[in-house]
């Protein structure tokens, strides 16, 4: 886990993924440049760390207070869990983490 935290920091806290997740949670937007950049960032992360860093990215959005209400929180975490599939990252598939 400390290794994954370090990866999270090395890859600019997956900023593009955070941007994508925020838009997805707030407006349900699925496309756009943030997604492409996010997938590029995710592909550079060690496979075992993909889900942990996505969980961190989702939490970062929560802490920044950008996500409002249970519906947006649900959408945020659902989107984060699905990103490895959307980005077609081999051998990761859907992340299993829950909100905490």
UniProtKB/Swiss-Prot annotation:
Lineage top rank: taxon: Eukaryota
Species of origin: Capparis masaikai
Keywords of this entry: Disulfide bond, Seed storage protein, Storage protein, Taste-modifying protein
InterPro entries: Bifun_inhib/LTP/seed_sf, Bifunc_inhib/LTP/seed_store, Napin/2SS/CON
Record GO terms (molecular function): nutrient reservoir activity
SS bond list: 4-49, 17-38, 39-87, 51-95
Protein's name according to its UniProt entry: Sweet protein mabinlin-4
SUPFAM superfamilies to which the protein is assigned, alphabetical: Bifunctional inhibitor/lipid-transfer protein/seed storage 2S albumin
Family statement: Belongs to the 2S seed storage albumins family.
Assembly: Heterodimer of a small A and a large B chain linked by disulfide bonds.
Function of the molecule: Heat stable 2S seed storage protein having sweetness-inducing activity.
């Amino acid at each position: 886990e400390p290794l994954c935290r370090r990866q999270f920091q090395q890859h600019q806290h997956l900023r593009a993924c955070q941007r994508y997740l925020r838009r997805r949670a707030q407006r349900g937007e699925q496309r756009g440049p943030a997604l492409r950049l996010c997938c590029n960032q995710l592909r550079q992360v060690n496979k075992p760390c993909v889900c942990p860093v996505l969980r961190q990215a989702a939490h970062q959005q929560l802490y920044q207070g950008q996500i409002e209400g249970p519906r947006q929180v649900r959408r945020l975490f659902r989107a984060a869990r699905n990103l490895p599939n959307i980005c077609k990252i081999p051998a990761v598939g859907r992340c299993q983490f829950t909100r905490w």
